[in-house]
Amino acid sequence: MRYHIMESRDIRMNLATEEYLMDHADIEEPLLLLYIQEPCVIIGRNQNAYEEINLRYLREHGITLTRRISGGGAVYDDLGNMSFSFVTKKNQTAFGDYQGVTQPILHALHRMGATDAQAGGRNDLYLDGKKFSGNAMYTKHGRTYSHGTLMYHVDLSVLDQLLTVSEEKISSKATRSVRKNVTNIRPYLDEKWQGLTTEEFRDQLLCELYQVESLTAIADKRLALTVEDRQLIQALFDEKYANNQWIYGETPAFDIERRTRIPNVGIVDVKIATKAGIIEGIHFFGDFFGALPIDELEQAMIGLPFVYENVEVFLEKHAIEEYILHFTKQACLDLLFD
């Protein structure tokens, strides 16, 4: 396994670097990326920024907003968080196998004293029943990356102000507080590691992953960027991750809205614009995952009569599960027409 530590503290630059390396790096052996960023919110590929984030709070506090190319929900990072990403050949990682992908991280944390760290839910890691890591995957061109957060000593007080909790995620016994359901890793580590900075925590975790005493022992495993790499990453930053059209998207006027939450799928929110019974625009939002880009399905549905039987025939030819993981044809029909 090779690794690359990102120097930038801008999440938009780090995501641009991640996507660039996924597309262009030599991955004959897996590649591990590590990055830390200034306060920011990253929404999932399929989410609606206006519904997920307190945008006023974000603006007032100078917090960066961007969108990633993978699915899943919104996350808040600051300098107390360390993000990681494994880039592999597609046949080396089963899409949605978060337990398998995160095992090396969990084993490293166990060696540092957080012995109760474990995988749970669809895509999360937990300590003492509280989430400290959310993960997401993306696949294209025979390659897959799985990336996640590691909340080392994040300012948890910000979460309630910034992230919106949907009604579908709130049960009668649940709490509206995001903060009460998450935790930081630092208090669970052996005492000798609890005074580390985020950068020192990153370096020690890397040593534990390789089971070496210091980074000098794995210096030959470190991937360095060329001048050309940096120029192409900057272009991706400008064209995509710092581009408001990518971040906020285009939101046309919709006349039909449906919303559901399904176990092991997540929230699926569909908005449909029709004219004379024909679909003129359709958009699926949510914290779901998918192996294929949802916009490909949306484009294919434009011009389709918004009639149960017509949509049923369409879905027989287009596997909805490829776009929304574990979402069945019948579940889609029920959402659209019930």
PLM region descriptions:
Residues 136-137, 150, 260, 268-286:
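Short beta-strand elements
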Residues 1-96:
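N-terminal lobe of the biotin/lipoate ligase/transferase fold
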Residues 88-94, 187-195, 286-290:
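A generic structural motif
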Residues 81-122:
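Contiguous, small/hydrophobic- and glycine-enriched helical/loop subdomains that border
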Residues 112, 141-248, 292-338:
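Long, positively charged amphipathic alpha-helical accessory segments at protein N-termini or as interdomain linkers
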Residues 68-83, 125-127, 131, 136-144:
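FAD-binding core of FAD-dependent oxidoreductases
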Residues 119-134, 224-237:
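Beta-rich nucleic-acid/ligand-interaction surfaces
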Residues 228-275:
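Structured beta-strand/loop patches that form or line metal/cofactor-binding pockets in enzymes
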